[in-house]
Amino acid sequence: HKAIRRQRQMCIRDRVGIVEAWMIVMALCGALLFLLGIYHLRMLPSGGEATAHAGSVGEALRETGAIFRGFFRKRYIGIYIAFIVFYRFAEGLVIKIVPLFLNAPLDNQGLGLTEQQIGLYYGTFGVIAFVVGSILGGYFIAWLKLRRALFPLITIFNIPFVVYALLAWFQPASPLLICGGIVFEYFSYGFGFVGLTLFIMQQVAPGPHQMAHYAFGSSLANLGVMLPGMISGWLCDSLGGYHYFFMWALLATVPAFLLAARIPFTHPDTEEVAAEEIDKELINE
């Protein structure tokens, strides 16, 4: 009976092999995205005609240069860039290492989870927790407004790194406890990430070319994840494993807290940004 039960629980990888399993999963994802693309092509509104067109390549380049200059001339843009980058800096360190930590055997400082368990905890319970956290984070900001909610949001966003440090040091054998830590991570990520998104929308993007400037801010947030992710593997090996790596990740959260405590707000977070406030925001323009 145990053999039959195990056979039924086999994942795609066990049935067809690793390479073929990846091919099947990627093909299914590609087909799903293709169908969604056709659906959106037919159902979404066109958005109307563009209000302005570049007459030449030179004009397009000048407009692009004006967009970049406008972004870097915004008031407090230096501290805003630092805040956006460091908001997710610790996440960038941890996000590449956590799957390895969960899958590594106990004698290698890991938790010894199977791929099936990791997929279930992340792909099902984690996604649900992320959606719930995002919704509650939005209500939390609406209640307190962004200025007052920002520091609590960063705190909640970074608490999961404490959880992973504890998991690394104590290596609990309970799947329920480990799953709870992963669910809490995704809930906190959804709850806290709303604050960064709204900060970029309210304080960085307003003004001429606000869609482009919002894209710049979002790119900086992704840069704050990519850069530490590039060194996370080397850092984990250099520190001697997961124990000290997650402790180091906790130290990496400090700049975000320091910046959040003193971050200036260019625009009020209680009402729509007025046109005259946008004009005052730009320096030397």
Residue positions per predicted region:
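Single conserved hydrophobic/aromatic residue that forms the stacking wall/gate
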Residues: H1-R8, I12
